């Protein structure tokens, strides 16, 4: 049972790390490369979010992450990205 808890904790940490990496990638892209209205920005964002959602779905199916925890990871990332988008469009 302890091994399963360790695996669940590791899965949750990895998903959170991946979400943080997406946020960092988008920050770098906005800082250096493009504007939020650029199709490239939107494509990268959509692709990254899709990939993370698939990771979350897979972890949920394996029983490594509760569905609600997965939703919270996605929701937190969406909120952070929304704040970032607003900051760059208001400049």
UniProtKB/Swiss-Prot annotation:
InterPro entries per record: UPF0358, UPF0358_sf
**Family per UniProt?**
Belongs to the UPF0358 family.
Taxonomy, superkingdom: Bacteria
Q: What does the annotation say about its assembly with partners? A: Homodimer.
Q: What is this protein called?
A: UPF0358 protein MW0995
Q: Name one Pfam family in it.
A: DUF1507
